[in-house]
């Protein structure tokens, strides 16, 4: 059964549409948007092999002129060089202001396609068709786009909202287990920061480590509740002036872990899991939450077979240095999102180097 979640942003409202088994019907959902006839599908080779033809044929049947551009998978290709290649194809296709870039892939493809759409001709249409759990519940919603810089993740980017987020949960059946678990890290995050009922539902599940062991009803609930949580937050704070910062729970340390270990060695969800464990330890050390909160969170992460420990090769001193280049630094202070109860967090810039060394060293 299809579900529609409105994203009521004043300047650029759109919808998140969850349509199980609906990938081949995507053109029907684009029709009301009044897009121009040129659509460029951006994907990676693996995802394209699974779903590219389905999407392209659906668009062509509806009368769109369709182009494609494939970017190799992985964070190591999330660069300005890759964006330049995308621009070259957009130029050759003679994409116009009313043309559309359609992202068919995970978070990396979505971030890059969105940044390309935001910057080509100073902004063209952008549609998200996420194919990973992480992209469905997090990266595809809210308009954050961008690429990595050698010195840090997502340092180059823009806020640019899609015209539509179109989710078919059935495509997750081909997602590798490690990538599924990475997405579950973001789902657990929503339970900690916003939705205690979602957290409890995850605790009651028998196994969260594999999509094959997850009942379809629970998978649909996970996607719907997570998307709704993201929409609730983003619709109140589109450009991270305040509340939206809570979505960075686990990401402060997580981004440091990703960049210091080399993008792709530890994937984004695994790094966020390590970051959430770190945040809970810091919060308990500062007296902001009970030990039981960290215990419950850790049990969920372990049930999902996600890491909770810092990589043994990562020195705390190097982590401290990397944190100062994080996008969340304000007036020279690193902002941490710290849990106070299941479903509640606070934003703090009172986490000193000494606290980090005491809890993570």
Swiss-Prot record:
It catalyses: 7-phospho-2-dehydro-3-deoxy-D-arabino-heptonate = 3-dehydroquinate + phosphate. InterPro entries: Dehydroquinate_synthase, DHQ_synth_AroB, DHQ_synth_fam, DHQS/DOIS_N, DHQS_C. NAD(+) binds at residues 107-111, 131-132, 144, 153. Zn(2+) binds at residues 186, 251, 268. The keyword ATP-binding does not apply. Its cofactor is NAD(+); Co(2+); Zn(2+). One of its GO terms (biological process) is aromatic amino acid family biosynthetic process. One of its GO terms (cellular component) is cytoplasm. It comes from the Bacteria. GO terms for molecular function: 3-dehydroquinate synthase activity; metal ion binding; nucleotide binding. Its main location: cytoplasm. Keywords: Amino-acid biosynthesis, Aromatic amino acid biosynthesis, Cobalt, Cytoplasm, Lyase, Metal-binding, NAD, Nucleotide-binding, Zinc. Pathway: Metabolic intermediate biosynthesis; chorismate biosynthesis; chorismate from D-erythrose 4-phosphate and phosphoenolpyruvate: step 2/7. Its EC number is 4.2.3.4. Signal peptide: none annotated. NCBIfam families: aroB (TIGR01357). This is 3-dehydroquinate synthase. It comes from Synechocystis sp. (strain ATCC 27184 / PCC 6803 / Kazusa). The lineage of its organism: Bacteria, Bacillati, Cyanobacteriota, Cyanophyceae, Synechococcales.
